[in-house]
Amino acid sequence: MASLVAIAIAMALMVVQPGRQMTAFAARTSPAAAAEAFWRAAMPGAPMPDAIVELLHHEHGVASAGGKANGGGDGPPPPMNFNYDDYRALPRSDAPSPDALNRVAAVQNADENGVSSPPPPPPTVFFLEDAVRVGESLPLPRPAADATAAGAAAATALPPLRLYTVRSVRAIEGSSFVVCRGETTAGAGVYGCRDAATGPARAYAVDAAGGGGGDAVIAAVVCHADTSRWDPDHAAFRLLGVRPGGAAVCRAVADAHILPTNKD
């Protein structure tokens, strides 16, 4: 009788513990495997989106793809390939997760005189207003310090965008705004402001932190409330799955401040 009880207890432990055993094993292998095991244990039956899987394995994938590209003479692989279809299929919200619209290389090229050319403008990031919430993730341009620390050779392999977790959101009163941002050009600091939207808009001041509790960033978020006059072929409509005049389309500017204006 005692042996039967012992066998029953052992079988129960084998049934209950597989998720924990899987997580413990994955933690001893690699951070990416640990993250995937945690996802399976916490959300059984829900597949991890391809964008998250690619982000976890991005560093390894760039190294292998880069070697192949150098041998074949092709350009570097694309930094990140977010799948909007996966985000639209998520059951947690009717709105897709935020994603990047433009991909640019964060590398400065020198002209014939050896003087560095001005840095390219940061990539524009479009997303829906549902993403401006505490706990959501926003892709923002990678800080220039990241590219400098990585070196000029490795900077081409770095994705121009980096995911930040929203920690706080503060709505700015008003319907028209200007965004002000400081830039360094030719060793001199320049602080400029420009209109944030041509039509009615909503604005937010967002405090976000990089992955793993990294550097914090203050971002100005402007949501265009009326997109009825936008070009119907605008890439934001295609990627976000919305139509002109529908849901508000938002964009973020890192390290910027936003101020309301009174237009008579």
Curated annotation (Swiss-Prot):
Residues 1-18 form the signal peptide. Keywords: Signal. PANTHER family: BURP DOMAIN PROTEIN USPL1-LIKE (PTHR31236), BURP DOMAIN-CONTAINING PROTEIN 15 (PTHR31236:SF3). This is BURP domain-containing protein 15. Residues 37-263 form the BURP domain. It comes from Oryza sativa subsp. japonica (Rice). Specifically expressed in the tapetum, connective and endothecium tissues of anthers. It comes from the Eukaryota.
